[in-house]
């Protein structure tokens, strides 16, 4: 019996979990490592675009992901200055391009949990919590991963290592890979509330609010109880401390700026975080690969980061499968050529433009950006082209052209 190719995956966020599950389903031996003792359930990404739903279907999680989330056919742009809707975009225009012409709003910790549960069905797959990577070495024959578990260090040997261990990636740092880009001077405040913005103000499940004073994002998620809750994202002022931004008066002022009916008693979570636009100088060093946030970070406007990470995972597993079948080692570089190039052309470019569109302060430029959105909505051909990019379906198509 042929020896199983062993893949170690560092990081049990959704990208690492999808990578591990896809590896197991392709007949690899898999060890999934997570430094923490549990899955992180803090409010993070929740938007799963049509292109990513196709990949989620491939690993057998589409029904559960959809059942645990909210289906969002539309997304809207609003003008905070005039309190009016600017444009609405309809994913149903993609019905001839994908089996999933909609977005599913399912929190990322749910995807990680269901993926780990399914991973347990495969006898050659193992999940290890409280397992932190502390050293990596490699040669032509494999990679050695030193892992700290319960105060002791153990060494795992494998054929390949996937670093999906987040923006502060230990794997990336151990490889000495530069993380090129910048950090925004403002932080983002995320407020989760039970207030029903759809009932009160007519917002749909995904909303982008442009404002000359301050922009906002507003979207609905199901919650673990499936009762529904809303997340509102705001920029902080550069002079504002974390404590000031999360204080009751600031929280209430931000929420009532969207809907005067909001109250503090409906707020169930508040958080603040730094925001980056960064990309790793390399996605591959020998037998070690980076995927997800370990290889790229972007602002969350548009919900593209997690989606791009899942695309990384699926592209990488396909690359490893080709190597197992006899493709030359040089073909492994195709992963970097595809994923790094597409991250720059689709993720970095779109998220930077998304932020500029919402925060524009110059009256003439601001009007031009809003008018462009109106024109896109009015033209089905242009709207579909816009949706092909925002859903990353165009990215998936373009990947196949990069040899």
Stretch-by-stretch model annotation:
Residues 1-7, 22-26:
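Extreme N-terminal leader/targeting segments of oxidoreductases
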Residues 3, 151-160:
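Core beta-strand elements of the Rossmann-like FAD/NAD(P) dinucleotide-binding domain
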Residues 11-21, 115, 163, 267, ...:
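Conserved mid-domain beta->alpha element of the FAD-binding
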Residues 24-44:
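Glycine-rich FAD pyrophosphate-binding loop
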Residues 44, 49-118, 347:
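Active-site-adjacent segment of FAD-dependent monooxygenases/related oxidoreductases
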Residues 117, 160, 164-275:
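Conserved FAD-binding catalytic core of PHBH/FMO-like flavoproteins
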Residues 129-143:
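A conserved short coil-to-beta-strand element within the FAD-binding core of flavoproteins
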Residues 318-403:
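C-terminal helical "tail/cap" subdomain of flavin- and related membrane-associated enzymes
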């Amino acid at each position: 019996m042929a020896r199983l190719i062993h893949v170690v995956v560092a990081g049990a966020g959704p990208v690492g979990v999808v990578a591990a599950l896809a590896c197991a389903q392709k007949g690899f031996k898999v060890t999934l490592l997570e430094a923490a003792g549990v899955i992180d359930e803090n409010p993070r990404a929740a938007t799963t675009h049509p292109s990513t739903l196709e990949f989620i279907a491939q690993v057998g999680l589409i029904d559960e992901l959809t059942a645990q989330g909210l289906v969002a056919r539309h997304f809207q742009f609003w003008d905070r200055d005039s309190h009016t809707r600017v444009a609405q975009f309809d994913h149903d225009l993609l019905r001839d391009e994908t089996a999933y012409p909609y977005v599913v709003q399912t929190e990322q910790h749910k995807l990680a949990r269901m993926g780990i549960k399914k991973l347990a069905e495969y006898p050659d797959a193992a999940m290890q919590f409280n397992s932190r990577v502390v050293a990596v070495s490699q040669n032509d024959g494999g990679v050695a991963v030193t892992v700290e578990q319960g105060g002791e260090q153990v060494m795992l040997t494998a054929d390949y290592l996937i670093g999906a261990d987040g923006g502060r990636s230990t794997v990336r740092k151990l490889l000495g890979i530069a993380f090129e880009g910048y950090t925004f001077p403002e932080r983002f405040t995320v407020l989760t509330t039970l207030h029903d913005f759809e009932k009160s103000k007519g917002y749909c499940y995904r909303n982008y609010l442009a404002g000359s004073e301050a922009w906002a994002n507003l979207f609905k998620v199901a919650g673990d109880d499936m009762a529904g809750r809303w997340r509102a994202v705001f920029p902080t002022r550069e002079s504002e401390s974390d404590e000031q931004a999360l204080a009751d008066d600031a929280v209430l002022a931000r929420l009532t700026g969207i809907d005067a009916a909001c109250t503090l008693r409906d707020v169930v979570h508040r958080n603040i975080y730094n925001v980056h636009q960064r990309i790793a100088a390399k996605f591959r060093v020998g037998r070690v690969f980076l995927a997800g946030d370990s290889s790229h970070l972007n602002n969350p406007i548009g919900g593209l980061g997690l989606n791009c990470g899942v695309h990384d995972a699926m592209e990488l597993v396909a690359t490893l499968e080709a190597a197992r079948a006899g493709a030359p080692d040089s073909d492994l570089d195709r992963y970097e050529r595809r994923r790094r190039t597409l991250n720059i052309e689709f993720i970095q470019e779109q998220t930077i433009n998304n932020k500029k569109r919402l925060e524009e302060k110059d009256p003439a430029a601001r009007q031009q950006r809003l008018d462009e959105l109106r024109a896109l909505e009015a033209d089905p051909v242009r709207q579909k082209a816009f949706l092909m990019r925002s859903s990353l379906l165009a990215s998936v198509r373009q990947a196949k052209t990069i040899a």
